[in-house]
Amino acid sequence: MVNNKRKEIDNINEHHEKDYNHDNGNQQEKKKEEQPQQQQKKQCILSFKDVEPVEIYFWKVFRNIFIFKHIFSNFKSKQYGYYDLIGCDEIFFLNGRTNSMEIIIDNIKSNNNHQIIRNESNIIDIIHTFKKNDEKTRSFYNLLFSRYSSGSTSPIQLSSTIRFDENIDKWIQRMIKNVNCTALDQFIKFFKIDSEAIKKVMEIHIKPSFFGYTTYGKLKIYNYLKSINSLPTSHKLLPFINTDLEIFLSFDNKFKKFIKSYKRLIESTNLQEQQEQQEKQGKLKIHPNNKKYYEKLNQKILELNEIQTSQFTNDQLNSTIKNLLNHTTPTSTSITTTTTTTTTNLTIISTESNYNNNNNHNHNNINSNNKINLKDIIKKYYESIYLFFYFTVKPENKGVFRKGLFYYLKFKKESVDKMYERVVNKWNGSSFDHKLFFQSILKDINIEKNEKFELILNVLDNKYVKTFREYDHYIFFKAVFSSNDIELIDYFLKKIKQLQLNQIPEITKYPSIGKLICDYCHLIDKKEILDFYFQNYRDECLLFNDQNENCKYIQLELIEHYEYLTGSIGNRCKLDFIYWYKNLNFLDRLNRAIMKPLVYSIDFGGSSSDFKWLIDSNINNNKENSIINFLSNAQFKQPLDLEILGSSFSPYAAKLLTLIKFLFNNISKESIETKLKVINLKTDNKNFEEKYSKIEFTTTLTTATNLLSPKKSEDVGCLTIGKTESFNFTISITTLLVCLYKLDRVDDIIYLFDKLPEVFLKSYYSSIFTKEYCIYSISSSYYLELFINYFIANLNDTTNYLYHCLCIASEKGYTQIFKNIISSDQNSKYLLKIQTESNQSSLFDSKLLNDIVDKSISSLNFELSNLLIDFIDFSANGQNTLKMKILKLK
């Protein structure tokens, strides 16, 4: 595809070349006169070649009016804007939007009355989220501090009460506790805070124990504070350190992070100074071995200090340590452009050697002494850290710092038994320790097969009985089967069978072979294992039996081969719906089974709650299209309850839109009206169940296109492609209206209000849709104002609805809606006047209007609060009370 795009760009360039040179037949003198202009044009062509191919296609689409309109017709641009962004919480806004920082920057710079940042909690979430140390983040914090400080020159009155410089201590404390070096550094520079002030904050607000449980972030901020001389003497990283070595020294860490962690740790303390202090306090006895280890550590630190990060390639730095040691990452020198993959020895070449080699243009004369073995470097890092902890932790805590199994696997050549003794038995190993040990040993390609056989035999013979408990056998079984090594599995099964033959059946210790194979079939990751079971253990297990349910466990990548093996002996798979809807892959399996009725038998007898959770869980996993495919082809025994469609509060409510469009594609407002009329007739007898009964809809669907090849489809007897099917579902009136709202069918909602006011405006339907708890979560300022205008124009029975909408507008801070009401020439401003005996044209009493203002104060939108206080005819005492509330929050 890339080549095709490049060809197209070259063709475009060639076309331009021909256009520029179309006067080649002119006289030579004319050519010379045009030569500067030709050169200028050719220079433009060269810059054009630097454009990414995808950008060419973007502009082709962007300039095509028809395609452009079609794409942007899916965006509700007039409905959503800054006025609909309320607060910047960490989950839904900061991490839920890829451009959240840009939105905040734009909102601040726009001097808009509607500020997204509403309170200190929003700022704390920002500090917790944006920590990257780059120019963009630094500029962002400078802008933030400038905007929210007492010296701000913004012409707009801030709706928020935040003033960074009015409580310097509190914000320093928050930035340290959120380990945000970037924000703290910019904060100190912006407000020109001296080191003594920071020390004072540390002494009062940050306990020395804060650095006791050390993470990478805490090491980073500790060293930063130390570098600017802002650490009080009471705050020492050591001996309070209690680092989680399992995380800190994990071989799954990226190499570059591991190097940084090492440097942060070593830089955080002066070993010699600490040793001298401990000697003075009599805490450290000078023993020859201690001195030897201390000298060894210093020597390793010196050696590692000579190694520069620039000597490693980007591939190496971005790889995990485990991958580097397993030789699965391409490695290359830091200067040469060629990359070579190694399988025996990982090396880097010193920059000095590279420099000399490049100057001499001779890559064959590299001094072998200048080559550094990467494995040795990694080993030095680990040994240095282990020695470091030996000298810095309290004696009573030294027992928790043990070397991990992977350290012995990669850096020490020891027997399996000896490694078990070191990393498991010595520490009275937990189930997790056993799990890690067995899986690592059995999957390690560098350990001889005979040693693995011996391990299996020792476990089955209870050689590890000291720490190996009965239920730990299942951990071992899983480790064997997850190895996906046919030789190991075969050896294990034969030994199990042999042990069972020598035992009394009633007290057999281990499960049957057939049960073991089925219990762990979800671990099979290659066809050869399936073939092995099929050829050798087919009669001893249920894996390939007729109507077996093991298809639920087989990995999707292998399911086709499993179907082939099962079908080759005339058997079918069975897929029961009950209890399996929570499996992440169940919907994919279900769709596959529906399309292959000759291979699967399916029972759709699950309850409505089963189907609800199936849809719920898969919407959360971005599988809207799979759900649609399922609904298009499934044969339900009863209408499906889809009340989940009305979910407005779930974090994935927006993902439901695709499904809602699919279901309501051919359901007109007239058909909805007919259904509601039937519901309305049922309400006359005031029966609760009937009044709140669900509405049943029928939508027309087309069976999904089969994903299998035509030949395979013919073999398994797939459903007819393109066949029209009917699908019945039920929803409540509330959910119906929420769905119409989400589909931008607000006109249809108003149509239904007009046609069936008795349905929506009766007291027992007062909780439907327009209640504050429901409309609050989904309404934009644009549509909320539409509803307000509609209720104003139809005041017969809509006063309650109108009031709820005004409360929502106030709480969300939609200032413009109230400005429009106040400036309206349609005499709607009376809505914001107090109803009295002499003024019956108003709708709301003093308490109701007071509550509207209270909501704006609670949301910290003081501009709106002051607007309403000044306009509503409160008493002088009432105005003063509301203004005092504002002052208390400022």
UniProtKB/Swiss-Prot annotation:
Transmembrane segments: none
Leader sequence residues: none
Composition skew (Basic and acidic residues), residue ranges: 1-35
Chain spans, region Disordered: 1-39
InterPro entries with a match to the protein in the record: UPF0746_actin_org
Source taxon at top rank: Eukaryota
Similarity comment: family membership: Belongs to the UPF0746 family.
Protein known as: UPF0746 protein DDB_G0280811
Organism: Dictyostelium discoideum (Social amoeba)
